[in-house]
């Protein structure tokens, strides 16, 4: 099931449903399944009411999709089936690969107010040593 290294990334709470859609569509995107509801590895079938998983607790943003279970299921199915824009998939993938937060500018300012250096993407490894003798041109 797992391939490569475990990856995680901080996300803006308002982006949660987009990330969940990314996960639900991943088997389709990679060619393992033809439809998200065919996958046994996602919660899509549960979220559209085809399957009951008593251990699954829905996120508060999922509950905001509608007042009734049927309304939430329909809105979720429509949201997932419309798919994500290509740029959004790229941003989420890059965020995971680089362990970079995927947050809005407003959320980033609030989150990194006391430590702005953590908001920047840094390259792997140790920073290059600066030699003051070689920097004079």
Describe the role of every protein-language-model region.
Residues 1-137:
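Short Pro-Cys-Gly-centered "Cys-loop" motif that presents a nucleophilic cysteine in a tight turn
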